Amino acid sequence: MKKNFVSVKSKKNILICILFMQFFLTAHAQEGRHVLKQGFTVDFFKQQIQEPADWVPYPGINKSMAWNYILTPGHYAKLVQQAEGLLGYNWPVTRASVFLDYAENGNRTNFEKISFSRRDALSALVIGELLENKGRFMDDIVDGIWSICEETFWGVPAHLSYQKKGIGLADVNDPVVDLFAAETSSLLAWVSHLMGDKLDKVNPLIKERIYVEIDRRIFKVIEADPKYRWMGYGRKNVDSTLSYKERSFLERRPNNWNPWISSNLLSSVLLLEKNKDRRAKFVYQVFDVLDNYLDPYPADGGCDEGPGYWGRAAASTFDCLDLVKMATNDKFNLFNDSLIKKMGEFIFKAYIGNGYYLNFADAVSKTNHSPMLIYRYGKAVGSATMMEMGAFLANKNNGLVNMPEGYSFLRKLPELYYSNELLTAKSAEPLIGSAWLPDIQVMVSRDKESSTKGLYIAAKAGHNQESHNHNDVGSFMVFYNGKPVLIDVGAGTYTKDYGKSWVISSAFHNMLPVIDDEVQQTGRKYSASNVSYVRDGQKVSFKQDISKTFNDSFGLNKWDRTITHIKGKSILISDSYEFLTTKKNIMLPMMLVALPDISVPGKMVVKNSDDSSITISYDPKQFEIEIEEIILQDSKIAHTWGSTLYRAKFNMKNITKKGKYTFTIQ
């Protein structure tokens, strides 16, 4: 069988019971609390924030000797060597023709590769000079600063929709603030702050130019209150006359762009702005924006964008709070807030083992989080598990020889400064036995706490307009002995037509029914109902009705799904359905990383790479099975899963208006 999207070939005595009739009921009750501004006024920030010249969050060039005592000799030498490799760096040009690639053919990689490499180089050169302080990297640093200041736009072409004239070339008269304009602003602000007088000795206009460009491109734009969608203001005042699709899009709560950009805005203004009044108002304004992110945030701390985005969602929120805490000498401190703690702890609840994480929605199964970031966040909120997780990841990765990805000094400097503390901290892999996140409606359960041995299942309910949404209400993933068996394919490579990608369709998520070629629909109303979670001893049960994920007119009255995990024994997937009209075809997919053995009717055996195996049992009188081989053409997916995936298609026999079945995994 051939498909257009890929090459395909046919082949749980404590009882906790929570019933949710309406998704996000708890979370919505939280709206309007404005956590960050309780007692924190513009005047507070004016009085408490230190002057840029007095604030020394990390040793700058005038105290460069401190780094000799902070870093190990090996770490120090590696960082200097990285800078040495950039001596005489030929700063690549960001050409207009390459900038236009996105508008013309959807390619964003060509430009981004050039832009990011320039910033990576500048960051590495500054680290080298900061450690060594001999002046030999200064020419290249100045060239990098000037080169970046000369760019028409600090962001990327794919984000020019914020520009009045739309995508294409950047309008110098209409600077917009996207992720990477904000990142670049923060980079240059840190360079100015760290290098200080050393830049003035080359020429006083260098630091002046940095301020002028940040003021023009960032400060004044934000002060004009542009109400960008990432700021989260629009969702409160949506025109009721708009179509459902348009309203749904506008009503979505802001995603990771909000705290990510906010953290860079805060570092820029705290490091550069000398005017007390302006600085205080700007900080207050940024926190007003961040409140739009926190107010509707799920009260359970769950990140519906997935663990892959946690580093720029909850963790960027941490960056914001930590920056201002430092800048006010701890007068501003929100780390005792329960939501902030839960947001951080999501990361270990989403950890499966062996480097794998939950990857519902547009996330990847394996992601490299900064061990230091997890450790520091855990230390700030008093989470021993987070601290132990950070130390575990650091030791697993052979310490902190490598810097975190990207060019953010907001992340790199603490990574260096606290490195010895992290490497000597208590460590443990965070293998929790079970968890239930009621607001994002995600459950996880493993056979044995603190061990990857045996079965692990994660499942979700929710709705089909979650951040970075895939149509996956009712889906689940199964691991055995820490290895993936039934998977969520996860994120693919972003393109202009990514919204139409096969990875988003429910037809490629575990046991989500395809009924007469109809699949789950996209939108907030397409959601799970009658959701409940019960844990009783060694038995965990998760129930939901997924019928509302189809159009009302389709005639699906109910599709009740119960997932039961009997720890140490088996996982049961039990469904019962009811149609108002007769249906001809029902197919249940399962996504696999290995070719299964289906030689015995009623059994599908899936072998792991360690030669262990699990058996998925079904009634052969109810289903016949066929296997499709999916040759992966998306390099991002292939990087995670290899070149090939398999889709088991369970085709129902003798379809009636009412029915039920059970699949057993053991």
List where the protein language model places each region.
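Bacterial Sec-dependent N-terminal signal peptides
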Residues: 1-32
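CBM-like, beta-strand-rich accessory domains located in the C-terminal region of large
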Residues: 27-30, 159-163, 393-402, 492-666
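Solvent-exposed loop and edge beta-strand segments that line ligand/cofactor-binding
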Residues: 55, 106-118, 130, 165-181, ...
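Helix-terminus loop motifs that line ligand-binding clefts
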Residues: 85-86, 135-179, 183, 294-309
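Well-ordered alpha-helical scaffold segments within catalytic/enzyme domains
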Residues: 120-136, 182-202, 261-276, 315-330, ...
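Structural helix-adjacent loops and short alpha-helical linkers that scaffold large soluble proteins
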Residues: 129-142, 191-214, 269-287, 324-340, ...
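Active-site lining segments of carbohydrate-active enzymes
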Residues: 167-306, 416-427
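Carbohydrate-active enzyme catalytic cores, enriched for enzymes
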Residues: 314-486, 534-536, 640, 651, ...
